[in-house]
Design a protein with these regions (language model features):
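Short, intrinsically disordered, charge-biased short linear motifs at domain edges
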Residues: 143-149, 158-167
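Short, non-ligating residues that shape and space the ligands of small metal-coordination modules
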Residues: 167-168, 181-186
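Cys/His-enriched microdomains
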Residues: 154-157, 173
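Hydrophobic residues embedded in beta-strands of well-ordered beta-sheets
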Residues: 172-173, 188-190
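Short-chain dehydrogenase/reductase
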Residues: 43, 112, 130, 146-148
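Flexible, glycine/small-residue-enriched loop-and-beta-strand segment within the central core
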Residues: 2-10, 16-18, 25-125, 156-158
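Short cysteine-rich clusters marking metal-coordination/redox-active sites
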Residues: 159, 175-178
Length: 193
């Protein structure tokens, strides 16, 4: 761990045994715990806790007041909105030790999770999925899916640029920002050339 390759605010706590990528920024009052892995060019906001053995890919943006618990893996280009929550135990009890029962949650490349959303552990988030603010995710989210509400329900599909996709009668949609085309078949979206 070479401090010259990343920035950590003087109030941030970086435990021994972390791997932090070049160009990453860690802001005020954040705590990076042992054996966590943070990729290159990540931004870790204020008051963030990254627990042991968490893995963040490259260019992950973690906004203020997020706790990322053991068992969470975020692939490249993931966005975690302010005060969103991951759980890592299915049935927590204060008097029952469950440290060996952490449940894995995988957030795939390009997914965005909105402010104050909750992701119940064990529910993977697909590539470029978009979790609306305040949503409570209690089941797997498909790639490119837009989910909202409590419990979260699918409300459409999103482009890789974060725009809602409107599919025509042939199952084709165009992102208004990038011009990229998408195909909807069998309740799955894929980008086409």
């Amino acid at each position: 761990m070479d401090k010259k390759e990343y920035f950590a605010h003087e109030t941030a706590v970086i435990d021994e045994g972390c791997s932090i990528g070049k160009g990453t920024k860690i802001w005020h009052f954040s705590h990076i715990m042992p054996n966590s892995v943070i990729g290159e060019n990540c931004n870790i906001g204020q008051n963030v806790v990254i627990s042991p053995e968490v893995v963040l890919g490259r260019n992950v943006k973690v906004q203020n007041n997020v706790s990322i618990y053991t068992g969470v893996i975020c692939e490249d280009d993931v966005f975690l909105g302010p005060s969103m929550v991951f759980t890592n135990i299915i049935n927590p009890r204060s008097a029952v030790v469950r440290k060996g029962e952490y449940v894995r949650t995988l957030v795939k490349r390009g997914a965005s999770i909105g402010a104050n959303a909750t992701v119940v552990c064990g529910n993977d988030i697909g590539e470029f999925a978009f979790i609306g603010a305040g949503a409570v995710v209690t089941k797997e989210v498909l790639p490119y899916a837009l989910v909202i509400g409590n419990p979260a329900r699918q409300a459409g599909w999103m482009s890789e640029y974060g725009h809602k996709l409107n599919f025509n009668e042939n199952g084709i949609a165009v992102c208004p920002e990038s011009g990229e085309k998408y195909k909807l078949e069998n309740n799955r979206v894929r980008k086409i050339k």
